[in-house]
């Protein structure tokens, strides 16, 4: 049985960068809808609840064809959003430190160059999707995925271990930023939880 994970902070905690109305809809409506689809799919295919969702979506080709699409979309959506909420924090932002900062400088030249590349990946993702910072073969890379796909999936164009992701579906920013996606991406850096990202990097 899948459940909507708590955010860990109030909906208004990320103001003014991400507004309370967006956070509320995004969590209670959009994320909750994925949970509903997963529970309905698990009723048809009970194996869905036997393993962590990350493990299942990393091997989509092993999922029965009649449930593969909802598992990919809703399983991806549930994993991506759970990961996204933990990537954000009130009074956060700033810049990473320590080993992660060194790895970012080594891979991209500087923190600003990394942000530019990440923002470009988010801004140029056509339609809906996500931009990611991943570890691939021991190195940091920026990638993007369509829809609710992510770099864990065996179907992803660029596979790796996600460290940070940003949702560029319109529902993630439209109420406040309308079609100004680059403005939302610029604001996102003010609420990135670098402690969490560093913790993921240590484990990757």
What are the language-model segments listed below?
Residues 1-204:
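Feature for soluble, non-membrane regions of globular proteins
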């Amino acid at each position: 049985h899948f459940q909507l994970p708590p955010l860990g902070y109030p909906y208004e905690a990320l103001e003014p960068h991400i507004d309370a109305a967006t956070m509320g809809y995004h969590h209670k409506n959009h994320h909750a809808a994925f949970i509903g689809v997963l529970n309905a799919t698990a009723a048809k295919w009970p194996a869905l609840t036997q393993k962590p969702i990350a493990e299942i979506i990393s091997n989509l080709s092993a999922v029965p064809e009649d449930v593969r699409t909802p598992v990919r979309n809703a399983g991806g959506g549930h994993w991506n959003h759970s990961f996204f909420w933990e990537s954000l924090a009130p009074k956060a932002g700033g810049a990473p430190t320590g080993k992660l900062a060194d790895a970012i400088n080594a891979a991209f030249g500087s923190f600003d160059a990394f942000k530019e590349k990440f923002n470009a990946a988010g801004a140029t993702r056509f339609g809906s999707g996500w931009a990611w910072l991943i570890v691939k073969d021991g190195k940091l890379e920026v990638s993007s995925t369509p829809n609710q796909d992510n770099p864990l999936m065996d179907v992803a164009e660029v596979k790796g271990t996600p460290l940070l992701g940003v949702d560029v579906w319109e529902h993630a920013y439209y109420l406040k930023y309308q079609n100004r996606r680059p403005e939302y991406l610029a604001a996102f850096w003010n609420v990135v939880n670098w402690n969490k990202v560093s913790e993921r990097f240590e484990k990757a």
